[in-house]
Amino acid sequence: MWHQVGLHGRMTTETDGEIMKRKVTKAIFPVAGLGTRFLPATKSIPKEIMTLVDRPLIQYAIDEARAAGIKEFIFVTSRGKSALEDYFDAAPVVEAELRRKGKKDLLELLKMTNMESGAIAYIRQQKALGLGHAVWCARRLIADEPFAVILPDDVIASEKPCLQQMMEAYAETGGNMVAAMEVPAEKASSYGVLDIREDMGALVAVSGMIEKPKPHEAPSNLAVIGRYILTPKIMDNLNRKKSGAAGEIQLTDAIAAEIAAANNVYGFRFRGQRFDCGSKAGFLQATVAFGLARDDLHDEFAAFLHEMVSVRKAAE
């Protein structure tokens, strides 16, 4: 199929293959969720602003996107998320006070929150109809370009950021790509699970996807994690607004439709450790891991943890 693309009055034609190989510079961050697992904290602050050590979850997601070459950041938000917008705004009063006190190190830290003018956009998801619907809400900003999706709940610790690893693989394959990891069979019902057509090591050719299958229905133990590189055709599939698991519009179903249309979908086994910061246990595990990884905190924090474990053992 050929596509007519209009850009500032210039017309071009591109094949599907050319679109699939185009460089990915846009990312969608679905951040409209209420974060009810973290009430009462999330009554007044977005879950994405909750911090691992001294950085909010959204900062880890932004840093990963930047490292992968993303230039345009699209946030799909909802009511009560204004703190996310404030976080990426300039803070002249704070900066002036830090300059007055000569706190150059803190001024330098604030630079990570700086966004280039026009690089960030906010789209409101009016109704909570699922992840697929949240992605679909950004369709006009995506237009006919391939794009990434990052779920800030999934924080991945790795030497090379997960999305950057995926981008390198995508440059060779094109198509649609999802981050994947092995999960225990009893936990498969919490994920989208891949049906594997060909296992090539880090890369897996996918023949099907099932959202939150029952344990006996899971086609493999390879689960989808919150990183995606997708073609614009996904938006066409989402536009049909078919309800899937839990009565929601599922992104997994839109990707599965690409498989049915004989378009390439790959799973990518990333190198790194994933933390589910959408759960309290996962958030605490990430806090410990990221705290221990900090040179300025490791010794004191490790000693504290050792002491806590010793006290618990002595009390048993």
Task: Report the location of each language-model feature.
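Catalytic-core segments of class I nucleotidyltransferases/pyrophosphorylases
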Residues: 148, 167-171, 200-303
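Residue-identity detector for glycine
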Residues: 6-9, 17
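Conserved beta-loop-beta/alpha segment of the NTase-like Rossmann-fold superfamily
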Residues: 94-97, 108-196, 232, 238-241
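Residues at the starts of beta-strands that form the adenosine-phosphate
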Residues: 26, 71-73, 119, 146, ...
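Conserved beta-strand scaffold positions in the cores of enzyme catalytic domains, especially
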Residues: 49, 120-122, 176-178, 265-267, ...
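N-terminal glycine-rich phosphate-binding loop and ensuing alpha1 helix
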Residues: 21-99, 125, 161-165
